[in-house]
Amino acid sequence: SIPVTPCGARTGLSGGSLPVKSGLVLSLEKLNSIIEIDERNLQATVEPGVINEVFQNAVKEKRLFYPPDPASKGSCMLGGNIAENAGGPKALKYGVTKDYVLNLEVVLPSGEIIWTGANVLKKATGYNLTQLIVGSEGTLGVVTKIVFRLIPLPKKDITLLVPFNCSEKACDAVSAIFRAGVTPSALEFIERDAILWTIKYTDIKLEIDDTVQAHLLIEVDGDNLENLYEDCELIENVLKKFECGDILLANSSSEKENLWKLRRSISDAVKSNSIYKEEDTVVPRAELAK
């Protein structure tokens, strides 16, 4: 028998698309249709070769929201996101890929084509095959169609960039924000070298003080702008206890886009400045400073 490894855009960090020696790679990049966006049922049916960001933009036009947004969202494919159970910055508030998958069309190794679930939010019949397939890296079958659930698009968001002279204090501030009762839609830690290399690598203009050792990139979202400002005030009060510097508030869409471009460009920037081996690691939030 010849081993077959399905693959999408090959942007993953854990090697899920690497073929077995003497095996074949099955590229799904040409299965790239958004079949349906069902606004009434808040669902979408897509093929696995659709680019994550293309899908996000398509549902956004209908005031709907698909939260999983890996750093590689501009190039990664939804089939790969399924295979790896991808997350992204918004996983903090909204969860990861598995939380939005309702149903999958899968070709099994036997050649049989099955649907793993149903296009409903609650299904109590039989095994939960959908969640078995998500994160299985293509080892159980080839996903050929995906049914996602969607949510209403938040109307407002605010983005903050917060400098710290001490990396450990920046890390400790993260848990303190949650203890204060605020759940940001995204919260990213960026250390000094990463942000300096990324500024050099991109066309983003940002002044970094010589004493700054780390930044927190924070986003809050919702439907009421007044409530978001209250969240930001609460976050600011927490951060001051950890001796943060002057907080940069993104005042326009372009400023927000630049800050997130900064975050999403870190991997490529670091690669261009060093001998770099990518890893995809997770640590408990409270242990981050260690």
Model-predicted segments: where are they?
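Noncatalytic alpha-helical scaffold of FAD-dependent oxidoreductases
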Residues: 1-290
